[in-house]
């Protein structure tokens, strides 16, 4: 039989297999044809008619229609990108060169013309007085040749890796952000994803609820549809709607607070989950409110965290499921936290949960918010986008224009 397979990224391909074969045999065939890196057997989940196919069951038991398709979900292994070993190797190599040069005998010979001839095992021996072993004069003479060229050799060693470290650091940081946000869909791709998941046999309301609970992660949404949404987050949203505008400024302070809690991350990782320290951060509580109301702001938040604290973004990328679970937890009421002094700068108030929440803004910030509101967007969304984009008016305008407000 010819099985049509489709990924959540709209990639379609076909596999010819005997219907008497098991589901695991189909997974192995997918891995052999599409590559072990992209489709590992251990990370594959095959879904047909809203059910996950069991590895030990024969394909014919599921009565797969060749006109329909089987959904392939792939859980990618965590990519560990740590440039630290490279720097330690560099420091070790630098240490060995300095040690070898320091242990070299202080024999003043004429400098060798080519510094690249240092590793030559048979140098020109000018006065090799004690030739006890053929291996010992070679390091000594090599060290003598390294002596005059010590500075020129160390200079590229010191400069070249630093430039590559900076570029690799930037690329690894961008890779972390891409890894953390690659599974998120927004805008038109969101609507396409809703239609795609509905074709698996689910109602639109179910699909939208699952996507909202998974913060627009299609892989997680399908799991929620199959296994059930943990904690029934939809009912939480009805019973306890989070305040809208009380969480604008904390968007930027979340990453700042995370930067100050890097030491906490390392200490808690030994005793518990690496992300558990976020529960005690009031900034995370506020960030959870704004993300639960508007999940599409999550990519902007992750991008900001990636700039200010790449280590935290790496932890989030490696523990996405736990991070989303923490975001889905009900928001605790912050009693009397939103008050404060009302100094000369303006304030913006919005009703949320039966009480007023105030954000202190400068006159310039208030003017920027008013200009964004003049574009036709609701005040609550304008405030969220403005602070989520670090008070960058142009970025906030572009962000608002890309959103699909009909869904909200």
Swiss-Prot record:
Domain Ubiquitin-like: residue ranges: 1-79
Domain-related comment: The ubiquitin-like domain mediates interaction with MJD.
Compositional bias (Pro residues): 112-122
Gene Ontology, cellular component aspect: cytosol; nucleoplasm; proteasome complex; XPC complex
Compositional bias segments (type: Basic and acidic residues): 144-153
Function summary: Multiubiquitin chain receptor involved in modulation of proteasomal degradation. Binds to polyubiquitin chains. Proposed to be capable to bind simultaneously to the 26S proteasome and to polyubiquitinated substrates and to deliver ubiquitinated proteins to the proteasome. May play a role in endoplasmic reticulum-associated degradation (ERAD) of misfolded glycoproteins by association with PNGase and delivering deglycosylated proteins to the proteasome. Involved in global genome nucleotide excision repair (GG-NER) by acting as component of the XPC complex. Cooperatively with CETN2 appears to stabilize XPC. May protect XPC from proteasomal degradation.
UBA domain: residues covered: 188-228, 363-403
Family: Belongs to the RAD23 family.
Biological process according to GO: nucleotide-excision repair; proteasome-mediated ubiquitin-dependent protein catabolic process
Subunit structure: Component of the XPC complex composed of XPC, RAD23B and CETN2. Interacts with NGLY1 and PSMC1. Interacts with ATXN3. Interacts with PSMD4 and PSMC5. Interacts with AMFR. Interacts with VCP; the interaction is indirect and mediated by NGLY1.
Keywords from the UniProt entry: Cytoplasm, DNA damage, DNA repair, Nucleus, Phosphoprotein, Proteasome, Repeat, Ubl conjugation pathway
Region (Disordered): 80-176, 236-274
InterPro entries: Rad23 (IPR004806), RAD23A/B_UBA1 (IPR041811), STI1_HS-bd (IPR006636), UBA (IPR015940), UBA-like_sf (IPR009060), Ubiquitin-like_dom (IPR000626), Ubiquitin-like_domsf (IPR029071), XPC-bd (IPR015360)
Feature: compositional bias, Low complexity: 80-111, 123-143, 154-174, 255-268
Modified residues annotated as Phosphothreonine in this record: 155, 164, 186
Subcellular compartments: Nucleus; Cytoplasm
Modified residues (Phosphoserine): 174, 199
Keyword Nucleus in annotation: yes
Protein's UniProt name: UV excision repair protein RAD23 homolog B
